[in-house]
Amino acid sequence: MMKHICALLALFLFCSVRLLAKVYVLSIGIADYPDKKNDLRISDNDAKTIAKVFKATNEAFVSVMLNEQATKAALISRIRSVFANAQSDDAVVLYFSGHGSPGALVCYDGLLTYQSIYKEMKVCRANRKIIIVDACYSGKMRTNNQRSSYFDTQNVMLFLSSRTNELSQETRYKNSLFTIFLERGLRGGADKNKDRKISAREIFDFVHQGVITASGDKQHPVMWGKFNNEMTIIKW
């Protein structure tokens, strides 16, 4: 009898945890590169900020990689391990702040091509997949000639801080311009219909307008992918 009670209790606890574990977040920020000439000021703070936003919810499992932790091999390994836990009704969020290069993100020790990211995202079971990139030339992610058709057929949102030929602006504050508005939006500023949920369309509209205005029309965030505009990014 006691064994049955223990088994039922374990099942109940598992289900309870499962109901809360709806968002898997990997937040990456690289400000300190091996060549100091390439250092940024606040990219690691950007990653900490976005991680903190999601940690404030009861639904998120959050993993953070900063600076020398974010090598190419380690990043791919962490993507696999974090997102492997997601089930079909969950969401996964990959956030990156650092240097960008046409066709790739600049990890601590080299380039991680967008094609490699496509490959890892493709095997993830989550139906809601969000990739947010705060980096120069991040818009290249949606225009690369080798871009997989995967993003045309799967429920993946690409939210990029700038157009293909634009720089993503740092600020004198603790976060970049894009991430300042991203944080504000995720904390409720983008909740236009006041339902305590931030949708894909709401966060894009809020950040897009804020960044364009604050940058003097020099930086234009872009959104790409085939997904439901009402897809929930976060509940705040």
Identify the residue ranges that each predicted region occupies.
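Sec-dependent N-terminal signal peptides
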Residues: 5-14
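Cysteine endopeptidase catalytic domains of the caspase/legumain-like
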Residues: 3, 17-236
